[in-house]
Amino acid sequence: MPKPQSKRSSLPNYIKSRGELIASLQALLANDHVDLEILRSGVPWPSATEIVQLSQVSESNEDAPVAACHSSNEPVVVDPALGDDSHQAHIDLDVNWLSNLIPYNGDELSEQPDSSLFCSPPERMSVSDSSNNTDYLSHFSSSSICQWDNLLDSIGSQTFQDTINVLSPHCQDSGVSQPSNLADDTLGQGQPVSTVVQPQHPGSTERDESVSSIASSQESPRKRQRPHYAIEKRYRAGLQERFEALRDCVASLKKTQHEQRLPGTNEDLAEGDDGGSVSDRATVGRMNKAEVLNQATLCIRQLQEENEVVMEYIKLLIKQFRVMKQAMQQALKVDINS
């Protein structure tokens, strides 16, 4: 099986990336407010538009006024009516105030209960201007409390019975049958409760089977799935294409390094994993996959180290350029003023 060769040229992409780097560097030189820490090794350079946006944000932050801090010692405005005691309410309670709150109309107690049942005779429940006592529980005796509880129990039982008597005629008039009562009556009479089962027609089963068969026949046929070997073949072809591109890149890089070396150095005699020298392997021809991956790893590490050094030098040069730029601007201002 012939190996597919990569016919895509990387020259347009290289020119595009080079132009983007130049534009980013020019934007850094033009905008002095951008922090240089955005340049880090191993991280793609920010685009020119991103650098301009960062510069605008930093300038707006510098021009923004500082928010005034309010101290906690400022006087707090308080409504004088809240602290004024001249408008206090005067409450005078009647002796029979508790009995008046209970609208009782039963047959057992036709008359209103005497005030002596609830409150002791010598004590009066009143609030004067000079009295601030709010504890009203001391005005009740033990006998009055017991009678009060009995009264509440009788009222609650009678109210519940009246509610049942009022609702029962409505249920009888509307003709709504209560399921629980019907079930109790049926079980009490000894009659078994039976459930109604709908009869099935003899031809219903055959009719259902015929309908299901027609529906299954009308379904669209399944899409033909691609066999596994075709998917595997396509995957291997794409992987081989990318590996060939990596092989070409490593070979061209090795060739460039071999041409730049000086003759008679120890680098030409360096041995690889298989015992052969690098120069001999470069002149022989194609490399196997292990050699390609090994050389690619070495190239990546070397590029990372060089990138770190170059990034530090770029930051230093940009800082020096900004200092010189500020000095020139100050000198121009002095000349103009003079």
Swiss-Prot record:
Signal peptide: none annotated. Keywords: DNA-binding, Nucleus, Transcription, Transcription regulation. Residues 223-303 form the bHLH domain. One of its GO terms (cellular component) is nucleus. It is found in: Nucleus. Residues 174-203 have a biased composition (Polar residues). Gene3D superfamilies: Helix-loop-helix DNA-binding domain. The keyword DNA-binding applies. The keyword Chaperone does not apply. Residues 171-230, 256-277 are annotated as: Disordered. Residues 223-236 are annotated as: Basic motif. It holds the Pfam family HLH. Transcription factor that specifically regulates the expression of the gene cluster that mediates the biosynthesis of gramillins A and B, bicyclic lipopeptides that induce cell death in maize leaves but not in wheat leaves. PANTHER family: BHLH TRANSCRIPTION FACTOR (EUROFUNG) (PTHR47336:SF4), TRANSCRIPTION FACTOR HMS1-RELATED (PTHR47336). This is Transcription factor GRA2.
